[in-house]
């Protein structure tokens, strides 16, 4: 018999089911803050992530029907606040949170509000370039809307004093941080427009956190800047700080000191410009006087050219020149006519028959002499070639060999005999001498022993 009652023994499934029911009934919905990690966004549209702090973490899920209402894109490392239900995933025994809503925490929430306001005002056209006013150059009086106790005012006044001490400055004091600051900034802008004593305004403050600068991200401040008839330079924080006022303002300065430089004139630069203008004016005067002097010289020269005596002298010189040209032309014409007459006379002389016949006879005699010389030269060359050929022919002729005492012996069949082996005793042979033939009959053969040895050796080698 078992020592445990069966009703006290849980199965794993029953235990997980009981724990899930307890969690859902006892805890209900809760608000939870933490840092996102292990964020997963599969194609199903659901979100799975872990919410953690420095000592613990818990798994979370947010289904597609809920995350559709989230107005920002969550990222790992981001601090958020969620409203969720605690439950337990029975197959694994893991408890988790089912998030129903999500919003950024701290600066993340402020950044979300900043982006939403920025998009809305941009859609209304408050940032359009066509509404930007041009800053006066030079400014006659500058208004500064900022805190009288902040470093921004000190920096602005110091820069204006250094660059343009004669430029008047009016300060419209206001708070730049806190709940009341946006309304005070709006009233200062409206007051400056009502008094209409400045032709440019600097609105800004020194650096700080996003929360410290939040007054310049207020919609009321943005609309007051946009409605201002006086051009406004936005100078909020440092160069890396960006506010809504920077987008709405007519010009953005990275710092309050830079804003003071933008609205003021540099005295040294002004002196340099005056000197430059003076130099340009002097150069223009010098150029104008030089032009007038050249014009006077030209007119004086023209007046001298129109004097009657000078005109008469020019006409006389022209007459002499024309007379010389006429003489030259006549001489040229006479020379050409003389040369043409000489050429015609030469051609006439060349056309007389006696001269042509004489030239033809001379040519015929010359050709006859050349032909005779060529024939004699060719005959001599042929005689020389014939003599050389006869000498060479006699050198290789058999008759010449016979004339030197040699003979040629043939067998009865006419075959030329070259050695004893071709002859048999009793055979009749014919011998050719220089001046005839001799027939003889072979009685004895006496071969040369050295020739026989050579033939045998040659036969054995082959």
UniProtKB/Swiss-Prot annotation:
Subcellular localization(s) per the UniProt record: Cytoplasm
UniProt keywords, alphabetically: Cytoplasm, Exonuclease, Hydrolase, Nuclease
Keyword Cytoplasm: yes
Keyword Transmembrane found: no
Catalytic activity: Exonucleolytic cleavage in either 5'- to 3'- or 3'- to 5'-direction to yield nucleoside 5'-phosphates
Cellular component terms per the entry's GO annotation: cytoplasm; exodeoxyribonuclease VII complex
Single Gene Ontology BP annotation: DNA catabolic process
Classification via InterPro entries: Exonuc_VII_L, Exonuc_VII_lsu_C, OB-fold_nuc-bd_dom
EC number in record: 3.1.11.6
Source organism superkingdom: Bacteria
Name of one Pfam family that matches: tRNA_anti_2
GO MF, one example: nucleic acid binding
Assembly: Heterooligomer composed of large and small subunits.
Function: Bidirectionally degrades single-stranded DNA into large acid-insoluble oligonucleotides, which are then degraded further into small acid-soluble oligonucleotides.
Annotated family: Belongs to the XseA family.
Name of the molecule in the record: Exodeoxyribonuclease 7 large subunit
Organism ancestry: Bacteria, Pseudomonadati, Pseudomonadota, Gammaproteobacteria, Enterobacterales
Chain's gene name: xseA
């Amino acid at each position: 018999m078992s020592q445990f009652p069966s009703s006290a023994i849980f199965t794993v499934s029953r235990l997980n089911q009981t724990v899930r029911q307890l969690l859902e009934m006892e805890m209900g919905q809760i608000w939870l803050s933490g840092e996102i990690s292990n964020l997963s966004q599969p194609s199903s549209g659901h979100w799975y992530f872990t919410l953690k702090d420095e000592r613990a973490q818990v798994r979370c899920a947010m289904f597609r029907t809920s995350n559709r209402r989230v107005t920002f894109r969550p990222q790992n490392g981001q601090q958020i606040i969620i409203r969720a239900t605690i439950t337990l995933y029975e197959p694994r025994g893991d408890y988790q949170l089912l998030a129903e809503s999500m919003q950024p925490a701290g600066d993340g929430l402020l950044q979300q509000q900043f982006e939403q306001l920025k998009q809305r005002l941009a859609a209304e056209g408050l940032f359009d370039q066509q509404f930007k006013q041009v800053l006066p150059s030079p400014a006659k009086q500058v208004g500064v809307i900022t805190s009288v106790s902040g470093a921004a005012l000190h920096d602005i006044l110091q820069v204006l004093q250094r660059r343009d001490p004669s430029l008047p400055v009016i300060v419209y004091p206001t708070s730049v941080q806190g709940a009341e600051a946006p309304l005070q900034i709006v009233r200062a802008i409206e007051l400056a427009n009502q008094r209409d004593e400045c032709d440019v305004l600097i609105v800004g403050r020194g650096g700080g956190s996003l929360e410290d600068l939040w007054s310049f991200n207020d919609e009321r401040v943005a609309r007051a800047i946009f409605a201002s008839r006086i051009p406004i330079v936005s100078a909020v924080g440092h160069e890396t700080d960006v506010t809504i006022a920077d987008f709405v303002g007519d010009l953005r300065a990275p710092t309050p000191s830079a804003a003071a430089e933008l609205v003021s004139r540099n005295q040294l630069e002004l002196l340099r410009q005056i000197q430059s203008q003076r130099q340009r004016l002097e150069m223009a005067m010098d150029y104008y006087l030089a032009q007038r002097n050249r014009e006077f010289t030209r007119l004086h020269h023209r007046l001298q050219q129109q004097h009657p005596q000078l005109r008469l002298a020019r006409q006389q010189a022209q007459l002499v020149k024309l007379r010389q040209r006429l003489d030259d032309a006549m001489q040229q014409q006479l020379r050409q006519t003389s040369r043409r007459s000489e050429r015609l006379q030469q051609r006439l002389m060349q056309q007389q028959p006696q001269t042509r016949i004489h030239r033809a006879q001379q040519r015929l005699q010359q050709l006859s002499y050349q032909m005779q010389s060529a024939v004699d030269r060719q005959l001599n060359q042929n005689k020389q070639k014939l003599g050389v050929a006869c000498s060479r022919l006699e050198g290789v002729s058999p008759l010449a060999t016979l004339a030197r005492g040699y003979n040629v012996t043939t067998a009865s069949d006419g075959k030329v005999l070259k050695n004893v082996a071709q002859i048999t005793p009793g055979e009749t042979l014919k011998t050719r001498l220089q001046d005839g033939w001799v027939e003889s009959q072979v009685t004895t053969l006496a071969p040369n022993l050295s020739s026989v040895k050579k033939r045998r050796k040659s036969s054995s080698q082959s």
